[in-house]
């Protein structure tokens, strides 16, 4: 996905101090952000001009100790054709020499009101999510108790209907039919809807419904961390399904492994309640409580007592 300077401005509500349409249309190619303190001191080894340049209180205070000519020389060296933009944090005053060098080198100058660390974190979060490589998977993503659950299964098995029931039970729809997944950082998988399908759910016999319009803003999310995969399968008498919770199945998406639970579907079974229970049980395991282990311990104790008798 291409991220432009204007997209960053709109997302973080930054002020454009200098920059025309052409400069704001520049592509940001990396999520890495540079704070050019060493460069201001004249050290340019390993300098990465393709990064966003963030000026905070430390850099700004150091600039104040320089003469006007030195300030201009610093920015003339920092600003390159491939530099997307420079952002000044805390609403600090923009030095005239910075503006002059930016105009001469074609670099947008932006200003943010937040602290430097807050602004840096917001930019990194946004850029990491937007620039990450994406994979589209078939399924429905629902946020259940703050945990993203990817529901998969054959076409027509009832994934969307199950998601609708979960929404009615107070959970939140993230994506239906197509889920775009990406690894935001090592070991963390996120999912979001395709833009054209945002907040929409397709129900056979009814058609497409807008979940946000029908159930309100609290019934949807734009993205969620995917932590569990539920696979709905047609119930077959000769098929063996896990009954004790011993299964350690996993699926791998974008290099991240997440647990996978197979749930049989048959007439009269309330699948949404089962999925809700599976999500809560998984969270309980993450917190250190394992009902399967508790059952095994009780069974072992019972066998030991019977053996003694």
Curated annotation (Swiss-Prot):
Molecular function, one GO term: protein serine/threonine kinase activity
Keywords: ATP-binding, Carbohydrate metabolism, Kinase, Magnesium, Metal-binding, Multifunctional enzyme, Nucleotide-binding, Serine/threonine-protein kinase, Transferase
GO biological process, one term: regulation of carbohydrate metabolic process
Residue ranges, annotated region (Important for the catalytic mechanism of dephosphorylation): 264-269
Gene3D superfamilies recorded: HprK N-terminal domain-like (3.40.1390.20), P-loop containing nucleotide triphosphate hydrolases (3.40.50.300)
Keyword Zinc in record: no
List of catalytic residues: 138, 159, 177, 243
Catalytic activity: [HPr protein]-L-serine + ATP = [HPr protein]-O-phospho-L-serine + ADP + H(+); [HPr protein]-O-phospho-L-serine + phosphate + H(+) = [HPr protein]-L-serine + diphosphate
Important for the catalytic mechanism of both phosphorylation and dephosphorylation: region residues: 201-210
Binding partners and assembly: Homohexamer.
Protein family according to the UniProt entry: Belongs to the HPrK/P family.
The protein's role, per its UniProt record: Catalyzes the ATP- as well as the pyrophosphate-dependent phosphorylation of a specific serine residue in HPr, a phosphocarrier protein of the phosphoenolpyruvate-dependent sugar phosphotransferase system (PTS). HprK/P also catalyzes the pyrophosphate-producing, inorganic phosphate-dependent dephosphorylation (phosphorolysis) of seryl-phosphorylated HPr (P-Ser-HPr).
Protein name per the record: HPr kinase/phosphorylase
């Amino acid at each position: 996905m291409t991220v432009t300077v204007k997209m960053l401005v709109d997302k973080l509500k930054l002020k454009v101090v200098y920059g025309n349409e052409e400069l704001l249309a520049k592509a940001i190619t990396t999520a890495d952000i540079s704070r050019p303190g060493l460069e201001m001191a004249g050290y340019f080894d390993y300098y990465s001009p393709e990064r966003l340049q963030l000026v905070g209180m430390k850099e700004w205070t150091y600039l104040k100790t320089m003469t006007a000519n030195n300030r201009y020389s610093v920015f003339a060296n920092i600003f390159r054709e491939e530099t997307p933009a420079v952002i000044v944090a805390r609403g600090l005053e923009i030095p005239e020499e910075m503006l002059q060098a930016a105009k001469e080198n074609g670099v947008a100058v932006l200003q943010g009101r937040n602290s430097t660390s807050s602004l840096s974190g917001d930019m990194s979060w946004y850029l990491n999510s937007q620039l990450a490589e994406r994979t589209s998977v078939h399924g429905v993503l629902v946020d259940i108790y703050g945990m993203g659950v990817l529901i998969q299964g054959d076409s027509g098995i009832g994934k969307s209907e199950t998601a609708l029931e979960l929404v009615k039970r107070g959970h939140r729809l993230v994506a239906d039919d197509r889920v775009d997944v990406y690894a935001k950082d090592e070991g963390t998988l996120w999912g979001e809807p395709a833009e054209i399908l945002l907040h929409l759910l397709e129900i056979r016999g009814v058609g497409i419904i807008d979940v946000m319009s029908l159930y309100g803003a609290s019934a949807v999310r734009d993205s969620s961390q995917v932590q569990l995969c539920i696979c709905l399968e047609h119930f077959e008498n000769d098929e063996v399904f896990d009954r004790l919770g011993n299964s350690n199945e996993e699926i791998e998406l974008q290099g991240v492994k997440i647990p996978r639970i197979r749930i049989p579907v048959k007439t009269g079974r309330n699948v949404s309640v089962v999925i809700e229970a599976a999500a809560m049980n998984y969270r309980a395991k993450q917190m250190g409580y394992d009902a399967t282990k508790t059952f095994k311990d009780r069974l072992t104790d019972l066998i030991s007592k019977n053996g003694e008798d």
